[in-house]
Every structure is written in C-alpha cells, then in structure tokens.
Design a protein with these regions (language model features):
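Surface-exposed peri-terminal alpha-helical interaction modules
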Residues: 13, 52-57, 71, 143, ...
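Internal, conserved structured core segments that host functional sites
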Residues: 49-111
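A cross-kingdom marker for long, charged
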Residues: 148-235
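Glycine-rich, aromatic-bearing surface loops/beta-hairpins
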Residues: 91-157, 215-234
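Short, solvent-exposed secondary-structure capping/transition elements
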Residues: 13-16, 31-33, 89-94, 205, ...
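Start-of-domain marker
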Residues: 1-39
Length: 235
C-alpha cells in the first residue's frame, strides 16, 4: 500500500494542511497482477508536526493530548484499518468487519477541533465517517457481496475460466446498479470504482457483444467520471 501526504499550506505554529492519497492493491490468484482495491484522495488532513517528533497511536486514546498532533496518527490508523478491511473482505465474505469496526472506533473517538474535519457526518458526504458507515450499515450489506464476488469469484477465477469470471464481474455491476438505484449518491459506490477503469475495460474488451454492451451501459452510469472512456473503448 502507499500513503502520499501532499502539503498545501503551513503556519509558523507547525500546523499543516494536506491531502492524503491512499492506494492499495490485492494480488490476483495464479498471476503476478495486482488489482487496485483502494485509490482514494482525502483532502481534509490538518495536523501539527515538529521535526523529529515521534508519532504514536493508541487505539484506547485516539485523541491523545493534542488533537492536531493526533489527527495525523488517527487518520493513518483509520486508513490502515480500512485497507485491511477491504483486503480481508475480498477473500472472505464479511471478513473485513473486525477492521471496519476498529476504523469506526477511531471515527467515534476522533480528535475534535476548529481546524479538524472529515470525522463527522456533517463534514460532507464523502469522508472518513461515511466510508466506514457505508460498510457497516446493515442497509448496505450487499456491498460485502460486491467486494467478495468481484475479487474472489471474479478476478481470482479469470486465469482458469475467463468467461465464467467475466460473467461474475458483470453480475457485480448489476448488483451495484441495484444498490445505486436504491441508495443514490452513496460514497461507497464511487469509492469502489476509483482506480478500476483500466482494469474493467480490459476485462470486458474481449467479452461477447451483448455482455460488452451491457457492461458499457452500466459502467457509464455507475462510474460517471470515466463514462467517456468506457463509451469509447467498449464499443
């Protein structure tokens, strides 16, 4: 996995405003290929840091003694648990729940302050609060099937039975379409597709015409950011 912290502003008080890009990939069975499982940019990371300062995280004392100092360690610990959660989820149905629950504990006990955001429901519709909420909300339980089916029943089977695996991945797109219809504009739907456009195009480029058309229609609807790319490359 990769964590890229990009500083955008600072002050004389050793306080930094930054964005954090989190990337993680999962090995695919019988190949050397790594499939992206997380590719997310968090634009709301404000923290205090003094050169050579030791960074420590205690899950029983998330806020620490200084909220701005602990905001960095809490954010990193949160995403570390989300990475583990999605990784375990892709190998075992609901296997990621223990890590999502740890991430939610961090959210519930997160540092609080005037310059700190991303931990609360009212901080926006796509932030740390909503990501883990979407994965633990029983109303959205189908997302556990989505992750498991996409990776374990789809991607992991591509080498041994490409047609069956592709059909499973198309079924995942249908599940996501149903989810999006019932729960429009949820963070987890957009989150799932980030970093996957090239992979999905390669999967469906060799599909039978009817499956390719259906996949293109669904992808253009579900992954609007890359809609033109799907339309052009999945003809």
């Amino acid at each position: 996995c990769n964590f890229l912290l990009n500083l955008s502003a600072t002050s004389d008080l050793n306080v930094y405003n930054a964005s954090l890009t989190v990337q993680a990939a999962r090995p695919i069975f019988n190949t050397t290929y790594l499939s992206p499982i997380i590719n997310f940019k968090d634009d709301n990371v404000t923290f205090k840091y003094v050169e050579f300062q030791q960074l420590e995280f205690n899950e029983n004392r998330v806020t620490g003694s200084d909220p701005l100092v602990s905001n960095l360690t809490a954010t990193i610990a949160y995403y570390a648990n989300m990475i583990l959660g999605f990784d375990y989820e892709s190998f075992s149905l609901r296997g990621g729940d223990p890590y999502f629950q740890k991430a939610q504990n961090i959210v519930n006990n997160a540092p609080d302050g005037r310059n700190i955001s991303g931990w609360k429901a009212f901080d926006g519709i796509r932030n740390r609060y909503w990501l883990v909420e979407n994965m633990l909300n029983s109303r959205y339980a189908i997302m556990h099937d989505v992750y498991y089916n996409y990776y374990r029943l789809g991607m992991d089977k591509l080498y041994e039975d490409e047609n069956t695996a592709r059909a499973e991945i198309l079924n995942v797109l249908n599940l996501l379409n149903n989810f999006n219809t019932d729960n429009p504009n949820k963070m987890i739907n957009q989150f799932f597709f980030q970093g996957k456009s090239t992979e999905l195009i390669k999967i469906f480029a060799k599909a039978p015409p009817q499956d390719k058309i259906r996949a293109s229609e669904l992808l253009q609807k579900l992954d609007i950011t890359n809609a033109a790319k799907y339309k052009d490359e999945l003809k």
